[in-house]
Swiss-Prot record:
Function: Catalyzes the reversible reaction in which hydroxymethyl group from 5,10-methylenetetrahydrofolate is transferred onto alpha-ketoisovalerate to form ketopantoate.
Assembly: Homodecamer; pentamer of dimers.
Residues engaged in binding Mg(2+): 44, 83, 115
Compartment list: Cytoplasm
Record GO cellular component, one term: cytoplasm
Keyword entries, A-Z: Cytoplasm, Magnesium, Metal-binding, Pantothenate biosynthesis, Transferase
Protein name from the UniProt record: 3-methyl-2-oxobutanoate hydroxymethyltransferase
Phylogenetic classification of the source organism: Bacteria, Bacillati, Bacillota, Clostridia, Eubacteriales
Biological source species: Clostridium botulinum (strain 657 / Type Ba4)
Length: 275
């Protein structure tokens, strides 16, 4: 049975943790979905891990719709959330509702995610009014990387911490069904999670959130050159892939692959007529 926004709320209400991961294509979505995950975020992080951009700012709506379609086709259980990219909702409330609608109508997503606190409250209200579920996102919001001066922990001083608490309450009031808390101190995320009735989903926000999300390439160690402090390795897929590719190259070079069992047969009398 498909997880829904109601499932997320039910899990919080009974004290059961919510599990989420990112996915960007059909194959990985199918694997993650079959593992029993509650939700999949088609994150604009695809700009960095799939498209090779330095940050998420270059990702377009067309990129997001394309990848979200693929993920939806690979799932039957997880709630699929489409990440609204930079400048798809900041320009006007009309654009916010229109682009959120594209995720639902064209891509088949079940909800959308917006970054920001009080500044996007009106956009969230309008999207929810259009019957589209919205996941909020506060703390380190990657689309604001230039304002933050880099990817830095947020909420370490009293002023910013109080603003994050207030932002969470505003997002709940605006109609968000859950909120991602990214890169904020663990004790602050505990206060926020206890201050609102909707679920919090942490990424680098400690154990007190109602759920957790990670980028699957990070938690499966697909890239060895970058590993955020908050990521635990749950597998070493990157090394396995490199080992497999290296072995493939070796066997092709040495004519060990393909073997007879990998080849298709033809009768010798047919072959003889071809010479």
């Amino acid at each position: 049975m498909r997880n829904t926004v109601s499932t997320f709320q039910e899990l919080k209400d009974r004290g059961e943790k919510i599990t989420m991961l990112t996915a960007y294509d059909y194959s990985m979505a199918k694997l993650i979905d079959s593992s029993g995950i509650n939700g999949i975020l088609v994150g604009d992080s695809l700009g960095m891990v799939c498209l090779g951009y330095e940050n998420t700012l270059s990702v377009t709506m067309e990129d997001m719709i394309h990848h979200t379609k693929a993920v939806v086709r690979g799932t039957s259980n997880a709630l699929v959330v489409g990440d609204m990219p930079f400048m798809s909702y900041q320009t006007s409330i009309y654009d916010a509702v229109y682009n959120a609608g594209r995720f639902i109508k064209e891509a088949g997503a079940h909800a959308v995610k917006l970054e920001g606190g009080a500044t996007v409250a009106e956009e969230i209200k309008a999207i929810v009014k259009a019957q589209i579920p919205v996941m909020g996102h506060i703390g380190l919001t990657p689309q604001s990387v230039n304002m933050f001066g880099g990817f830095k922990v947020q909420g370490k001083n009293e002023k910013v911490a109080k603003k994050l608490i207030e932002d969470a309450k505003i997002l709940e009031e605006a109609g968000a069904f859950s909120i991602v808390l990214e890169c904020i101190p663990e004790k602050l995320s505990k206060i926020i999670s206890e201050s609102i009735s909707i679920p919090t989903i942490g990424i680098g926000a400690g154990k007190y959130c109602d759920g957790q999300i990670l980028v699957y390439q990070d938690m499966l160690s697909m890239f060895s050159d970058f590993k955020p402090k908050f990521v635990k390795s749950f597998g070493n897929i990157g090394e396995s892939i490199k080992d497999g590719v290296s072995q493939y190259i070796k066997e092709v070079k040495e004519s060990k692959f393909p073997e007879e069992k990998h080849a298709f047969k033809i009768d010798d009398d047919v072959i003889n007529k071809l010479y």
